């Protein structure tokens, strides 16, 4: 940890080293209410640290114990909500109790895309176009859809891989590598519509501000949609 005042190191933590080169970065989530920070290393170690006391609250290893060590571990960004953290990894998708690190539920579904988390649901998507709606409390699958498998759906080679999902009102907005918006009914997973939003593709994931969608394309232009 680095002081924002003078740039000096406040805390250094040595984690288990990984000898594999990977494009995936360590994911970090801040809990400012309880002064905690959560992060996952590329070796599959999940840490909870209090950044005021500089103490480790708990440590959990979510990489399979029977792994040979040669497999690539990755995780999605961490979502922190109501004393739980949610993330997907190369192993499974998890809901974790932030107080003690215990697993609330685990689902054998892997993705590196950030999940959507509400009080009732957790939505997951893979790059290949597979969408899942999960009950937040139990981890049970409510519905699942494969967007690119049905004949009436857009083809993956046309619209590209999914790179992000966002809940917009009563729809899931998915963005793709080839600059498409996909609009999905959150209740059923049905694809409602899709449109080409950027010719160059997306540089950033979209955000919602004042009922408008903002994103940055690969030419570093800010795009705004109603």
Please identify what each model-predicted range represents.
Residues 8-34, 55-82, 90, 102-119, ...:
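Extracytoplasmic beta-rich repeat domains
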Residues 4, 32, 41-42, 73, ...:
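Structural signature of WD-repeat beta-propellers
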């Amino acid at each position: 940890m680095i002081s924002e005042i003078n740039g000096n190191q406040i805390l250094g933590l040595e984690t288990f080293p990984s000898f594999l080169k990977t494009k995936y970065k360590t994911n970090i989530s801040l809990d400012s209410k309880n002064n905690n920070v959560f992060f996952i290393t590329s070796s599959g170690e999940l840490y909870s640290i209090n950044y005021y006391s500089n103490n480790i609250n708990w440590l959990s290893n979510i990489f399979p114990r029977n792994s040979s060590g040669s497999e690539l571990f990755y995780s999605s960004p961490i979502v922190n909500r109501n004393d739980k953290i949610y993330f997907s990894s190369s192993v499974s998708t998890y809901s974790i109790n932030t107080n003690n690190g215990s697993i609330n539920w685990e689902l054998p579904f892997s993705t590196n895309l950030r999940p959507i988390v509400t009080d009732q649901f957790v939505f997951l998507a893979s790059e290949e176009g597979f969408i899942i709606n999960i009950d937040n409390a139990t981890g049970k699958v409510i519905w699942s859809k494969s967007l690119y498998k049905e004949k009436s759906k857009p083809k993956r080679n046309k619209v590209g891989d999914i790179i992000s999902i966002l809940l917009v009102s009563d729809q899931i907005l998915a963005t793709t590598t080839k600059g498409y918006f996909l609009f999905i009914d959150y209740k059923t997973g049905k694809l409602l519509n899709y449109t080409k939003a950027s010719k160059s593709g997306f540089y950033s994931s979209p955000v919602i501000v004042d009922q408008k969608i903002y994103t940055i394309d690969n030419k570093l232009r800010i795009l705004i949609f109603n």
